[in-house]
């Protein structure tokens, strides 16, 4: 028990130190990495988990709800791709649409935003209790979720912002799971059919609505 408490204490300390570092140096580091990247792909909402080809960000300097952050850090139409895993459900409906429009502005024509959110049509009552607004998963007091999306409502949100939507994973109203193959090199979604470790023995314990929101353009961004 003592060891467990000490490990928790160390994790909290590391988290606090990382937050201090990000507040002081994160924006400078982000600018340097972005300037050096031949393909400009960034992750929003997760500074700790990202693939090597992607540049992480932090809301201290690139908050989806603060357009001035984006204007200070980026030029419109300059990004090849964005990735947001389990971010949009933390935004109010008004914030969600405004954030989608921000992403549309800063993507190149043909660029894309890969999004994953909890699936409001997942057939497991336990899953829904975890992910619904005000719900609480294991070890959580509350999940901080504002909206529980389905494939229809999430797709409509991004279409309303001007995107063309490609759905990859979702449950439908009849409880059937739909899957279209997607390349993790184009943005790994960890809470998905293939990559979530809770999905064992053919049982889909935790999945997401996964889609690409593509900004229309003459040439779609290369995905490699």
Predicted regions and their residues:
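Membrane-proximal basic amphipathic "stem/tether" segments
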Residues: 1-38
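Short N-terminal helix-initiation segments at or just after the protein's N-terminus
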Residues: 20-31, 89, 148-158
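Short, flexible, glycine/charge-rich loop motifs used to bind or transfer phosphoryl groups or to couple energy/partner
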Residues: 30-33, 45, 69-72, 199-201
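Short, flexible hinge/linker loops that cap or flank conserved catalytic cores
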Residues: 35-36, 48, 203-204
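Conserved SAM-binding loop
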Residues: 39-125, 211-215
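S-adenosyl-L-methionine-dependent methyltransferase catalytic module, highlighting the catalytic core
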Residues: 95-104, 108, 112-220
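Serine residues within intrinsically disordered or low-complexity segments
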Residues: 222-224
